[in-house]
Amino acid sequence: MHQGKLVFAQVMAHLPLSTFRRCVARHGGERKVKSFSCLDQFYAMAFAQLTFRESLRDIEACLATQGKRLHHLGFRSPVARNTLANANATRPWQIYAELAQHLIAIARPLYANEPIGVELNETVYAFDATTIDLCLSVYPWAPFRSTKAAIKLHTLLDLRGSIPTFIHISDGKTHEVRILDALTPEPGAFYLFDRG
């Protein structure tokens, strides 16, 4: 019988917990929380992402199959679908946005010398957006067309290592040009845009 740490626990061991706790405290994420902490929520959503879960029911069922190993994955108790849904609906999203920016700042220097296929010493960025279709009856706050809802994900990608350095989510009608004002240009860097 294998006695080592589970792979998920090994991956989560790299999470800077002190930074995560600072983000949670800064945005009041643990206010009125009794048992399902922000860290539990993060573990559940990270598990869902890494195991390609597609719904809350899918996450709950997959975690339930782990039984006694759930503790070894980092969870303090079983994750209920309703509890996870409430946490996703009420917890400040800024916690996870700030954590993502911190993790990106750690990852970028690791790929600073990665070749990009073109002999340039300068940083090369690619800026693009993708439209994510949503159901209009479920997301009425994101109208896109008369029968459809959507949001747009604008991303600035550092081509060395393919690491996003800027991510902005807007309504589906926002053109990429309107987001350019939110970018802080880096002197000497090259920026690639499509005509979108």
Which residue ranges define each predicted feature?
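Conserved, well-structured functional cores that handle cations and Mg-NTP chemistry
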Residues: 1-196
